[in-house]
Every structure is written in C-alpha cells, then in structure tokens.
Design a protein with these regions (language model features):
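Conserved small/polar residues in nucleotide/adenosyl-binding loops
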Residues: 251-258
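Membrane-interface helix-loop-helix junctions at boundaries between adjacent transmembrane segments
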Residues: 95-100, 108, 112-136
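Transmembrane alpha-helix boundary signature
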Residues: 46-51, 79-96, 116-119
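Central hydrophobic cores of alpha-helical transmembrane segments in multi-pass inner-membrane proteins
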Residues: 32-50, 110-113
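Juxtamembrane helix-capping/reentrant segments at transmembrane boundaries
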Residues: 54-73
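Membrane-proximal soluble regions of multi-pass membrane proteins
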Residues: 127-194, 259
Length: 261
C-alpha cells in the first residue's frame, strides 16, 4: 500500500499536462491544486502519527520500488521540459495563460527537479547521484548538491548556513541571499575538497566547474534551438522552482540564536 501512496507524485505531471493542453482558468490548475485544494484537503485528513517498526523499516529499505519510482521521475521531467518548450510557443496564448504554464513547469522544477534530485543526491551511489544531478540541472540548481551535503548539513541553524533564515528576515531578501550565497559557498566547498586531496581548484573533478558549464550549455542550447522567448520562459520556470524551494527553507528553518542573525 505504501508504494501506491508514493506514486501520488504522478498527480503533478497529470495536473501540469492539463495546464499545458488547456486554455483559460485550467492553465492555472497546478497552482489551484497544490496551493489551494491540497492544503484545504489536509485540514480534513487526520495525519498518521504511527512510525514504522524496526522490522518494517528494514523491509521498506530493501524494497527497490521506491528507488525505481524516483528513477522514473527523470524521463517524466525531461519529457515535460521538452513539451513545455513546444506548448509555450502556442499561438494565441494570453499573458495569464503563459504565466499559468510557466508556473506549472516551475512547480515541476521544484518538486521533481530539485526535491527528487536532492533525495537522490544524498545517496552514496554514483548512478543515483548522476540522476539527481540531471534533475537539478533541469532547474538550474546543480550547486545544491555540494552545498547542501557539504555545507547546509554541517552548519544548519547557524549564521554560517546560507539556507537558514535570519531572525525577521524579509522573504525577498532571503531568496536572494540564500541562493547566491549557497552558490558561492558551493565553490568554496569544492575548492577546499580538491585542495585537501592535493589538486588544483581548476581540476576537472571540480563539480562546480562542470555544473556551471552544463547550466550555461543548457541555456545556450535552448536559445539556439528554440529562440529567446522559450529561453526566457525556461529561466522563469527554473527561477520559480528555486523560489519555491527557498520559500520552504525559510518557513522550515529556525533562526539561529547568534546576535548576527
């Protein structure tokens, strides 16, 4: 039964598909479902407060279906990204319909691109990590892995953590500070990692060099094959995904008690 609940992630591409193939109010269906209907539904559903037993936890960890479901999000995300490049060019779309479709893709960038990419990036397996990297690339947030694993977990809830909100910090300032500071710190983490292993910061194993080049190649490739409008639409969707992530970080992190926060 639990794997079936895990498949509820498929609600997202179904709803976004309706947005991509509709006009009018339905183009905003992803926002309506995930920011209104589901939160409203949660008010009437009692949460399950029971934890798994140790035996159940061991059994679930050995069940590969969960990993396969995560793997399955990769072709879904890439497929919808390609579909997005096509439907965003549809003739006759109003500005509000364009916003609805961009926001729908942005939700996919956040939930599948960043969230699932983050989960796979935590695993000590190169295949899992690579799939996570590709998913994060679709959201232009590849620096998330080195920073999150090498910085956030080490410094969470302290002034050193870019992703920890400062006391009374304005949300718009948090978006900017958290994202760009974590990007800079990701470079520092990679440089220190290579330095400690006796390698130059410009070594080919510097993930931030690879990630930055891949981000630029993706943006440039979209511009070359689809044009400026599609590129801007993709950037808008990716930024939407990043903002949704940063907003979650803001409201789930505790402000550090340090006087500088």
């Amino acid at each position: 039964m639990r794997p079936l609940k895990y498949l509820s992630i498929l609600i997202l591409p179904i709803v976004v598909y309706i947005s991509f193939t509709s006009k009018g109010l339905l183009t905003h269906l992803p926002a309506i479902v995930f920011f209104f209907l589901l939160p409203l539904l949660e008010l009437f559903i009692k949460p399950n407060k029971e934890n798994l037993t140790k035996e159940e936890e061991k059994t679930e960890k050995e069940n590969k279906i969960y990993t396969y479901i995560l793997y399955g999000t990769l072709p879904v995300q890439i497929g919808f990204l390609g579909f997005f490049f096509y439907v965003i060019q549809e003739v006759g779309l109003t500005n509000t319909e364009l916003v609805g479709r961009v926001f729908g893709m942005g939700i996919m960038c956040s939930i599948i691109g960043i969230n699932v990419g983050h989960e796979l990036g935590h695993r000590n397996n190169r295949i899992n990590e690579f799939i996570g990297e590709i998913l994060l690339l679709t959201s232009l947030n590849t620096h998330f892995l080195p920073y999150h694993n090498g910085g956030h977990h080490l410094n969470v809830a302290t002034p050193k953590d870019a992703a920890t909100a400062r006391k009374n910090e304005i949300i718009f300032l948090f978006w900017i500070r958290s994202h760009f500071t974590s990007y800079i710190q990701a470079w520092k983490i990679e440089n220190n990692r290579l330095k400690n292993s006796g390698r130059s910061s410009f070594h080919y194993q510097n993930r931030m060099i690879t990630y930055t080049i891949c981000n630029l190649l993706l943006i440039g490739g979209i511009y070359f094959f689809y044009g400026q409008f599609v590129m801007i639409s993709f950037l808008s969707a990716a930024i939407t995904g990043i903002i949704l992530l940063e907003t979650c970080l803001l409201y789930t992190s505790d402000a550090a008690d340090d006087s500088d926060c």
